[in-house]
């Protein structure tokens, strides 16, 4: 009689096999999701007061970047910053310096490709 049961797996072995199959399938599902870049988002920020409207996190899809705009008033020296995600279709204007339509203001744009690279502790501006 013992030989008859030697070929059949025990209940615990069957459960382990099922659990292993489920875990392998779950890991394959998670591998298929693209990795999003996490960026700092603040729509109105000054160096003196920080983020005025509250900050949060945005997710940039693969091939996209984090971005910070610096709007500089050349006469008063006050700076306003906007930080957000930049989709790959919009990355043509990632690094530029141009005058604003408003006299005396300049706009500097900078993109970066690391996690939270545009948050206040990590960002560096190269301003002429």
From Swiss-Prot:
<feature type="disulfide bond">
    <location>
        <begin position="42"/>
        <end position="51"/>
    </location>
</feature>
<dbReference type="Pfam" id="PF00021">
    <property type="entry name" value="UPAR_LY6"/>
</dbReference>
<feature type="glycosylation site" description="N-linked (GlcNAc...) asparagine">
    <location>
        <position position="73"/>
    </location>
</feature>
<keyword id="KW-0325">Glycoprotein</keyword>
<dbReference type="GO" id="GO:0032991">
    <property type="term" value="C:protein-containing complex"/>
</dbReference>
<feature type="disulfide bond">
    <location>
        <begin position="39"/>
        <end position="66"/>
    </location>
</feature>
<dbReference type="GO" id="GO:0042802">
    <property type="term" value="F:identical protein binding"/>
</dbReference>
<dbReference type="GO" id="GO:0009897">
    <property type="term" value="C:external side of plasma membrane"/>
</dbReference>
<comment type="subunit">
    <text>Forms oligomers.</text>
</comment>
<feature type="domain" description="UPAR/Ly6">
    <location>
        <begin position="37"/>
        <end position="128"/>
    </location>
</feature>
<comment type="function">
    <text>May have a role in hematopoietic cell differentiation.</text>
</comment>
<protein>
    <recommendedName>
        <fullName>Lymphocyte antigen 6 complex locus protein G5c</fullName>
    </recommendedName>
</protein>
<feature type="disulfide bond">
    <location>
        <begin position="94"/>
        <end position="111"/>
    </location>
</feature>
<dbReference type="InterPro" id="IPR026110">
    <property type="entry name" value="LY6G5C"/>
</dbReference>
<feature type="disulfide bond">
    <location>
        <begin position="112"/>
        <end position="117"/>
    </location>
</feature>
<feature type="disulfide bond">
    <location>
        <begin position="58"/>
        <end position="85"/>
    </location>
</feature>
<keyword id="KW-0732">Signal</keyword>
<keyword id="KW-1015">Disulfide bond</keyword>
<feature type="signal peptide">
    <location>
        <begin position="1"/>
        <end position="29"/>
    </location>
</feature>
<keyword id="KW-0964">Secreted</keyword>
<dbReference type="GO" id="GO:0005576">
    <property type="term" value="C:extracellular region"/>
</dbReference>
<dbReference type="InterPro" id="IPR016054">
    <property type="entry name" value="LY6_UPA_recep-like"/>
</dbReference>
């Amino acid at each position: 009689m013992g030989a008859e049961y030697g070929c059949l797996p025990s209940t615990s072995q069957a459960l382990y096999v099922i659990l292993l199959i489920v875990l392998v399938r779950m890991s394959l599902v998670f591998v298929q999701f693209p990795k999003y870049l996490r960026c700092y988002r603040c729509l109105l920020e000054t160096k003196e007061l920080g983020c005025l409207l509250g900050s949060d996190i945005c997710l940039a899809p693969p091939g996209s970047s984090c971005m910070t705009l610096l709007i500089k008033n050349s006469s008063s020296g006050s700076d306003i910053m906007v930080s957000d995600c930049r989709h790959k279709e919009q990355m043509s204007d990632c690094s530029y310096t141009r005058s604003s339509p408003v006299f005396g203001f300049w706009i500097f744009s900078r993109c970066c490709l690391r996690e939270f690279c545009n948050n206040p502790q990590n960002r560096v501006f190269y301003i002429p």
